[in-house]
Curated annotation (Swiss-Prot):
Keyword Transmembrane helix: no
Species whose genome carries this gene: Streptomyces griseus subsp. griseus (strain JCM 4626 / CBS 651.72 / NBRC 13350 / KCC S-0626 / ISP 5235)
PROSITE patterns: AA_TRNA_LIGASE_II, TGS
Gene name for this UniProt entry: thrS
Reactions catalysed, as given in the entry: tRNA(Thr) + L-threonine + ATP = L-threonyl-tRNA(Thr) + AMP + diphosphate + H(+)
UniProt function note: Catalyzes the attachment of threonine to tRNA(Thr) in a two-step reaction: L-threonine is first activated by ATP to form Thr-AMP and then transferred to the acceptor end of tRNA(Thr). Also edits incorrectly charged L-seryl-tRNA(Thr).
Protein name: Threonine--tRNA ligase
Record keywords: Aminoacyl-tRNA synthetase, ATP-binding, Cytoplasm, Ligase, Metal-binding, Nucleotide-binding, Protein biosynthesis, RNA-binding, tRNA-binding, Zinc
UniProt-annotated location(s): Cytoplasm
Amino acid sequence: MSDVRVIIQRDSEREEHVVTTGTTAGELFPGQRTVVAARIGGELKDLSYELRDGESVEPVEISSEDGLNILRHSTAHVMAQAVQELFPEAKLGIGPPVKDGFYYDFDVEKPFTPEDLKAIEKKMQEIQKRGQKFSRRVVSDEAAREELADEPYKLELIGIKGSASSDDGADVEVGGGELTIYDNLDPKTGDLCWKDLCRGPHLPTTRFIPAFKLMRNAAAYWRGSEKNPMLQRIYGTAWPTKDELKAHLEFLEEAAKRDHRKLGNELDLFSFPDEIGPGLAVFHPKGGVIRRAMEDYSRRRHEEEGYEFVYSPHATKGKLFEKSGHLDWYADGMYPPMQLDDGVDYYLKPMNCPMHNLIFDARGRSYRELPLRLFEFGTVYRYEKSGVVHGLTRSRGFTQDDAHIYCTKEQMAEELDRTLTFVLNLLRDYGLTDFYLELSTKDPEKYVGSDETWEEATETLRQVAEKQGLPLVPDPGGAAFYGPKISVQCKDAIGRTWQMSTVQLDFNLPERFDLEYTGPDGSKQRPVMIHRALFGSIERFFAVLLEHYAGAFPVWLAPVQAVGIPIGDAHIPYLQEFAAKARKQGLRVDVDASSDRMQKKIRNQQKNKVPFMIIAGDEDMANGAVSFRYRDGSQENGIPVDEAIAKIAKAVEDRVQV
């Protein structure tokens, strides 16, 4: 046996080892059960991979991003084996890892029931305890077709070997240049227990799966296309330890309590009537109050910052979107055309920017007018498949707080800095404080403009982002074809990350629309264009805030800021006078004049998450005072009426949480 020299790479440390031919990657890390795979030459490999001379080996820990994906992918295989042991007629689809878990699609006659999921999970536990070995083997196309002749969906995947997409998860099975099958082998006899078409890598054995749980099942089209058969998808989650699984399940329980769709119904804020269709919300009076408060504050802050408000129609001739390029790049996300005016195609607008460009171009512009900051609460419409529509966060019709800034090249850095500072400060005003920034840079395969322009713009964005003193995460190749961007990522009250605002440079539209301004020397020059969406959309931001606050909005956003609770019916007129006086100062105050007992009224308003309850009885009436009850159940008594109203007004003015 000859010697093989390899390098073990751990972060910045490099160790050279001499091993014999046939040594596997796993043998470099004996007893280290947290190591589940290896990265060799930039590619993930099983620990059973035989090392070659000169290779660099980086251990992959189970708790790393790659390690978690491998854990979850292997668990998906165990689930598929369990399903086929219990339901032999089930045909296999695709089973990739996803964020915090995995899924697998199956073609079965009947949808899985909750009892089925329990049985599948029990069978998975049996398979896990068997310690089956995951064993990789390379097969020819012909051999794969022969082995998987009874799996029609696998046969289809074999036909797209090497060109599979990550969008539908097919790349986890046939994304490489060769076909491989993973066998699950009995650890004692080596007999085949189950097999699947898969790229891998996988865990060494099923005993490396410490903690998992099946979550739910749902219908899903094969490879995400409505033209394909409907399959049954089972979702699960897997973690390196039982404690991490427990923490994740507790997190999901809390997230479910905060689900904006649930809270929207409980608090009577909005709904999605079947008569209107998926992804199209109607806001009820209380939801309308919150939305108006959000918009009014944003409008005032934009006016203070020098933005000019514009309005544009909801539909336009198709020629506009041909000019902008949307029909070339975004046609799949647009609604079909309406033929009007003797066959002219009209479209519902998916974006506001083309119309803002027409406003800029409506007359000659001078450098003295720049920067020109146009702002609109513009409603747009995007065709989303019903399977991806999700409450207010992914909808078909929504209103963007959309700004487009036109400036000179010399003004670009200052304007980007000013815009990002404004964005972050405004988000903080709504109670979001935990941010990091993401810088999306050029995709070398898809971009317009010169390399020099991109490099200069990207460096300017980088400097602007770094000035904020926030973590800056690179997103190489993540920019749209027309320019680099900064995204503001925000963590909510339970640690989930939401993409909020974007600040995007555009080298494409000013050229397409031939936008010009007159420079100081009288020459025609091209403006720099900046896209900026602060909330993303009003609806989505509404949902984020609703979940962030769990429905208990700060006083200034609460639909009802205070409710009068009379101790008895005789105290109702007194509280109604209090409410009328407060409303004259712009406060949202109601009185619960129902026939319910006082304690039930208090419980009802606690469920409604009202910031203040104003309680009054005989002594309060005699003294011209009220009692304040807070959300946490604490109470202040004997507060004079004017002082009580001023207290509510102060909480609104300071935008505080109570």
